[in-house]
Amino acid sequence: MHEYSIVQSLLESCEEHARANGAKKVTKVVVKIGVLSGVEPELLQTAFDTFKEKTICDSAEFSINIQKVEIFCNRCNANSTLQKNEFACPKCESVDIKVTDGEDMYLMSLELE
């Protein structure tokens, strides 16, 4: 489960941001997870709940936003959100596409006190 190592890095990042802003605790952590990121939201939630104890995020709420796959079609120049895992442009059906979102995980925001 690589979610544990992801959460450890996430908690370190939260601590760095809190320290840099003079905060004593983090009350909310918001992340965005792309459906192609390979990160399982349920496992990430479990890992966060496990590892946040005795950290600056001890009482933090953890919010996960799921990002669908967004593409740009090189043929018709359309931006689209894929509804299923069919990697073709929904407008012209070309497979000459570039994924523009939905592959990564990002720390979107922190609420600090």
Protein language model regions, located:
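Cys/His-enriched microdomains
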Residues: 71, 87, 105
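Short cysteine-rich clusters marking metal-coordination/redox-active sites
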Residues: 73-76, 89-92
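Short functional micro-motifs and their immediate structural scaffolds
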Residues: 81, 97-98
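Short, flexible, mixed-charge glycine/proline-rich loop motifs
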Residues: 61-69, 78-83
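Short hydrophobic/aromatic patches at helix-to-coil boundaries
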Residues: 109-113
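ATP/adenylate-binding site constellation spanning eukaryotic-like Ser/Thr protein kinases
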Residues: 94, 104
